[in-house]
Swiss-Prot record:
It comes from the Eukaryota. Belongs to the carbohydrate kinase pfkB family. Disulfide bonds: none annotated. The keyword Kinase applies. The gene is MIK. InterPro entries: Carboh/pur_kinase_PfkB_CS, PfkB_Carbo_kinase, PfkB_dom, Ribokinase-like. This is Inositol 3-kinase. Kinase that phosphorylates myo-inositol to produce multiple myo-inositol monophosphates, Ins(1)P, Ins(3)P, Ins(4)P, Ins(5)P and Ins(6)P. Participates in phytic acid biosynthesis in developing seeds. Phytic acid is the primary storage form of phosphorus in cereal grains and other plant seeds. One of its GO terms (biological process) is myo-inositol hexakisphosphate biosynthetic process. ATP binds at residues 217, 267-270, 294.
Length: 379
């Protein structure tokens, strides 16, 4: 699948080609993550059961730090930049994710969400929680982004903070752009309740041909319009315990899940998208990379808030990826096209990651209090 670019933007394409030349075989491909940190308050049965660092950028940076190939073995600085905004009331400045990637401070309060969890199990298209935005920080403007080229970008807004013009600037700066649908289609009523609008009716729709991947939950998929959007970019629909599906112009694929005991679904989709991006950085095809996305999505739901990954589990995952991927001087994140279909090692990769998932389960059993504090989602 070719990466789309405006045909008359010759200068932009020359800069992209220069990025390809300068990073090939170099120290790493720098990424750009755009989306704000939040205060998340988790409520069940009318009482607060958790207060955590939230915002897709926190979950995404957590997985990229853990799973990206660049610098992972050498303990180098993370090869990506996070642009997030918070207010002076931000209380998680010392949390690992936000400490590694400090946000921009502004005068408005930090974005805050209240998540009211249902007493009943969620269905395929019904949410297991009701979200309400109770405070909103300033949006992220194009001028807030670094003025340099990036190999890839992830637009992961949660409260409308990634403006259309900001996404367009990301597309100008980044060779490849991946977008979480929630950054594009969320709408908020007067009480802050989160709803959705059709992607085709938003100012973002015209940018889709220049985006490589859009990730949506099964609840968001009808608003994305999969059949229309797949003709412009690859659409990934996460289906929880059923794994995920990839749709592109002329093909589709189902990717199997990994078992998980769900404690808190917050951040599962964000962790999936970051795992998927990490898979592309390792040189996997899109469908193979979705296995890594499913793996980290499952890891995220087993803890409350931004998860902590056991070092043994991470080491096992890195060894699997090193064994299963070939050394490439130009990973597909920096190439001119993506391979979308499953490779001939897809099933082997899934089986190997299943074994790593056992380590994740053993960690949870050995230390059930690690980041959890009980099952928030069910009685």
């Amino acid at each position: 699948m070719p990466l789309a670019a405006e045909p008359d933007d010759a200068h932009e394409e020359r800069e992209n080609q220069q990025l390809l030349i300068t990073t090939k075989g170099g120290p790493g491909l720098e990424g750009l993550v755009v989306g704000s940190y939040c205060h998340d308050v988790l409520i069940r049965g009318g009482r607060i059961v958790g207060e955590t660092l939230g915002g897709a950028a926190a979950f995404v940076s957590n997985v990229l730090d853990a799973a990206s190939p660049q610098g992972a073995a050498l303990n180098e600085t993370s090869p990506f930049v996070v642009v997030a905004k918070v207010g002076h009331d931000f209380i998680y400045a010392r949390a690992p994710a936000s400490a590694r990637h400090p946000p921009l401070l502004c005068s408005s309060p930090t974005t805050s969400f209240h998540a009211q969890f249902s007493e009943t199990a969620a269905s395929a298209h019904a949410p297991d929680r009701e979200l309400r935005r109770v405070r909103a920080c300033d949006p992220i403007y194009p001028a807030d982004l670094p003025d340099r080229r990036f190999a890839y970008g992830l637009a992961v807004g949660v409260a409308g903070e990634v403006l259309p013009e900001t996404l367009e600037q990301m597309i100008r700066l980044c060779r490849t752009v991946l977008v979480d649908a929630q950054a594009l289609i969320r709408a908020f009523d007067g009480d802050g309740a989160v709803g959705h609008v059709a992607l085709g009716d938003t100012p973002y729709a015209r940018l889709l041909p220049r985006v490589a991947f859009v990730k949506a939950s099964s609840e968001e998929a009808p608003y994305v319009g999969v059949e229309t959007t797949r003709r412009q970019c690859c659409v990934i629909v996460t289906e929880g315990r059923d794994g995920c599906r990839l749709y592109w112009d002329g093909g589709e694929a189902h990717v199997a899940p990994f078992p998980a005991v769900q404690v808190d679904p917050t951040g599962a989709g964000d962790s999936f998208l970051a795992g998927f991006a990490a898979g592309l950085l390792w040189g996997l095809s899109a469908t193979d990379a979705a296995l890594l996305g499913n793996f980290f999505g499952a890891a995220a739901v087993s803890q409350v808030g931004v998860p902590t990954f056991h070092p043994k589990m991470l080491q096992a995952v890195k060894e699997i990826l090193e064994e299963k991927t070939r050394k490439r001087s130009s990973p597909c994140m920096n190439g001119a096209s993506f391979t979308l279909e499953k490779s001939n090692m897809h099933n082997e990769l899934h089986a190997a990651l299943q074994e790593a998932a056992v380590l994740m389960s053993e960690q949870q059993q050995a230390d059930p209090a690690n980041g959890s504090g009980g099952d928030i989602c069910s009685a």
